[in-house]
């Protein structure tokens, strides 16, 4: 049975997600509608991707009875409102990361999903890459002994990109790209809550974080260090150090296509796109789409690999890191 997708927002990430879906069998995934705030944008997107229906409002997409799941690709300050719209209309939802602006909003999203009895997942696509599944497999077999230290960094030169630096657009390094480093640590430590969170950072004149370093202390003398910046390109690697070896994730750690396990490299290539992409390795979004289909067909309301609890913990940690650095969004006081 084909999962029928609706695409919410006709922006860059929605383009890449739609291209990624096309790398999967048509009898399993079909994009049947797209909605944008301007009909012309939706129509242009629909034409480019051969999508049968285009809507000039998200409400029309929510009312379309022939949609199984909606992919939400709007900027993150809109995730809560748009997510609630679709879930209240009994639509399953795959929502871009961060799921919402803070823990309070994330909890509202989760409550709405439970109330409407629909599937909801934060689109932390990294977790579903074959390389990430291999990391989890290796760790479950104690391939590097007891993990003592995890390091992850993600930096990109995004100071000229409004959505990365403007507060009302949800800008800031942590929510946009630092989230990948934090989620990586939580993946390694199986969703365990850290005992201590220490964050330091520097802020732009707009009031959002230009760069942040977050240190997480876990039980059993385990540490993690996450570094993110929107001011410059970093090595964008991740490292897991155990008592008996190391796993290195070379660039690009948020969409990994290779692993170095004790110095031995294994490649995990992603498929080629049929249209040009906006972001690197975006066809790897196919893996999260496969997980959504698996869960929806099985009647599951969340994925065990990126659960509601995982999203809540991620938001909780980022809230505390922002509090320490002094990054406050309007959503924090609502």
Curated annotation (Swiss-Prot):
Pfam families, per database record: GFO_IDH_MocA, GFO_IDH_MocA_C3
The domain of life for this entry's organism is: Eukaryota
Assembly state and interactors?
Homodimer.
Its protein name is Trans-1,2-dihydrobenzene-1,2-diol dehydrogenase
Broadest EC class assigned to this enzyme:
oxidoreductase
Query: Which reaction is recorded as catalysed by this protein?
Result: (1R,2R)-1,2-dihydrobenzene-1,2-diol + NADP(+) = catechol + NADPH + H(+); D-xylose + NADP(+) = D-xylono-1,5-lactone + NADPH + H(+)
- Which family, according to the similarity comment? Belongs to the Gfo/Idh/MocA family.
PANTHER family assigned = OXIDOREDUCTASES, TRANS-1,2-DIHYDROBENZENE-1,2-DIOL DEHYDROGENASE
Q: Where is this site: May play an important role for the adaptation of the alcohol substrate into the binding site?
A: 176
**Enzyme Commission number, as recorded:** 1.3.1.20, 1.1.1.179
For this UniProt record, the keywords arranged alphabetically read as follows:
NADP, Oxidoreductase
Marked site, May play an important role in coenzyme binding, at 71, 79, 97
Q: Name one GO molecular function term.
A: D-xylose 1-dehydrogenase (NADP+) activity
- Keyword Calcium present in the record's keywords: the answer is no
Identify the residue position(s) of the site May play an important role in catalytic activity: 180
UniProt keyword Transferase, yes or no: no
């Amino acid at each position: 049975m084909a999962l029928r997708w609706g695409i919410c927002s006709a922006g860059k990430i929605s383009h890449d997600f739609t291209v990624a879906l096309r790398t999967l069998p048509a009898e399993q995934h079909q994009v049947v509608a797209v909605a944008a705030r301007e009909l012309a944008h939706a129509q242009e997107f629909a034409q480019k991707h051969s999508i049968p229906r285009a809507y000039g409002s998200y409400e029309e997409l929510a009312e379309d009875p022939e949609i199984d799941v909606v992919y939400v690709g709007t900027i993150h300050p809109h995730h809560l409102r748009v997510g609630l719209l679709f879930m209240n209309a009994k639509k399953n939802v795959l929502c871009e990361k961060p799921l919402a602006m803070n823990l309070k909003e994330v909890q509202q999203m989760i409550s709405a999903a439970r109330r409407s009895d629909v599937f909801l997942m934060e689109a932390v696509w990294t977790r579903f890459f074959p390389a990430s599944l291999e990391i989890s497999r290796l760790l479950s077999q104690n391939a590097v002994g007891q993990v003592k230290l995890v390091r992850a960094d993600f930096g990109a030169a995004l100071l000229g990109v409004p959505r990365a630096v403007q507060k009302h657009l949800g800008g800031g390094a942590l929510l946009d790209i630092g989230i990948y480093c934090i989620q990586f640590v939580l993946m390694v430590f199986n969703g365990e809550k850290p005992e201590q969170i220490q964050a330091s950072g520097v802020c732009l004149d707009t009031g959002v974080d230009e760069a942040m370093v977050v240190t997480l202390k876990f039980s059993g003398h385990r540490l993690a260090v996450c570094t993110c910046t929107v001011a410059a390109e970093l090595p964008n690697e991740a490292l897991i150090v155990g008592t008996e070896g190391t796993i290195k994730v070379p660039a690009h750690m948020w969409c990994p296509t290779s692993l170095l396990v004790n110095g031995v490299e294994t490649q995990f290539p992603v498929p080629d796109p049929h249209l040009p992409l906006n972001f690197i390795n975006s066809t790897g979004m196919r893996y999260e789409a496969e997980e959504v289909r698996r869960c929806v067909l099985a009647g599951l309301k969340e994925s065990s690999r990126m659960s509601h609890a995982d999203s809540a913990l991620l938001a909780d940690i980022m809230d505390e890191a922002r509090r320490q650095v002094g990054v406050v969004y309007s959503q924090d006081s609502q």
